[in-house]
Curated annotation (Swiss-Prot):
GO terms for molecular function: hydrolase activity. GO terms for cellular component: phagocytic vesicle. It comes from Dictyostelium discoideum. This is Vegetative-specific protein H5. Pfam families: Abhydrolase_3. It comes from the Eukaryota. PANTHER family: AB HYDROLASE SUPERFAMILY PROTEIN C4A8.06C, ALPHA_BETA HYDROLASE FOLD-3 DOMAIN-CONTAINING PROTEIN-RELATED. Induction: By cycloheximide.
Length: 337
């Protein structure tokens, strides 16, 4: 099965054909290769503040980036913004590309909070997630508002790929700990999230190789992320393993998947499980595209990326997506599950 047979656009096909799994390279060297994509100041307003992690979460300083929407500098000094807590992807081991958080901040007129959480294998499960949890709770209780411009009475959580795993696990962790902040999460948005470690799903078997993200590549990421197999039974490691009761009262959620992605089945299964728990959830599969289609710079101008971004920004902005879903031009591009 080849990428060409799925009607992928030229750029997506080039990504699939040029990408080679790097299973024999140290994670730190992979990070070096991505450094050119990390210029967070490029074309956007951002500030960075160091945040002190507790001893049990690394006992170190973590950089937290704050992305600001266009027009921020023209607003009064005391103007406050709603907040979005954004968790980047990268297979648990690579820093995220900054294109997506920039656009989300701009199109929602929000301050987007972007933690540089500890990456595996130096910070294995659950350290990165616990760092995000500590930061999130300190933002919500007012202990970390370094520029005094955040509204923290409610917040949305957004994550992509492995960051989507964290974005789904964080509310579950809050609920398990009986945190009052669980109820303050207004929405959860995840793009092609990792929700499980089952490598025999329909999408894993159908798109196991040749489609950018591979089955062997994901096994490699998981082996670096967890300390042992028993951790993979925990719902904050594999959210799909949460029971219906554990998912009750989960925040309103939008799950966006990519058709030719090994992760599409597990993301959609998680959405179905939320629905079975009577959670308000929408699951949208974007057809003819690959994993990473909204976050990769190369696919930014693709129809799939633009439709995916329009759908997700409407969701965060409380605008109906019916018109996009019903447009004739999009009927061959997306599937509502």
């Amino acid at each position: 099965m080849d990428p060409e047979s799925f009607g992928l656009d030229k750029t997506a096909i080039e990504i699939c054909n040029s990408y080679m799994p790097v299973l024999d390279i140290e994670p730190r060297l992979i990070r070096e290769g991505f450094k050119s994509l990390y210029d967070i100041q490029k074309k956007h307003i951002s500030k960075t503040k160091q945040y002190q992690l507790n001893k049990e979460n690394g006992d170190s300083l973590m950089d937290v980036h704050f992305f600001y929407p266009s027009g921020y500098e023209q607003n009064p000094v005391d103007h406050k913004y709603k907040a979005i807590f954004y968790i980047h992807g990268g297979g648990f081991m690579v820093d995220g590309i900054k294109k997506l958080p920039r656009e989300i901040s701009d199109r929602t007129n929000s301050i987007l909070i972007y933690p540089d959480y500890g990456l595996t294998p130096e910070f294995k499960y659950p350290l990165g997630l616990k760092q995000c949890y500590q930061l999130f709770t300190d933002i919500m209780n007012g202990n970390f508002n370094p520029f005094n411009d955040l509204i923290n009475d409610s917040i949305s959580i957004v994550g992509e790929s492995s960051g989507g795993n964290f974005a789904l696990s964080l509310p579950l962790m809050l609920k398990l700990n009986n945190s009052t902040f669980f109820k303050k999460i207004s929405k959860v948005l995840v793009y092609y999230p990792i929700t499980d470690c089952n490598f025999e799903t329909p999408s894993y078997n159908r798109f196991s190789e040749k489609f950018y993200l591979t089955k062997e590549g994901m096994k490699w990421c998981w082996n670096h992320y967890t300390n042992n197999d028993s951790e993979r039974d925990e719902i904050t490691c594999c959210p799909l393993k949460a029971t219906i009761d554990q998912l009750k009262d989960f925040p309103e959620t939008l799950v966006i998947t990519a058709e030719t992605d090994v992760l599409s089945s597990e993301g959609e299964q998680f959405g179905l499980k939320l629905s079975n728990a009577n959670v308000k959830v929408s699951v949208l599969r974007i057809l003819k595209t690959i994993h990473g289609f909204v976050s990769l710079d190369q696919t930014n101008d693709s129809i799939a990326c633009r439709v995916g971004m329009d759908l997700s920004m409407n969701f965060l902005n409380n605008i109906s997506n019916n018109s996009i879903i019903n447009e004739n031009n999009n009927k061959t591009l997306l599937k509502l599950l």
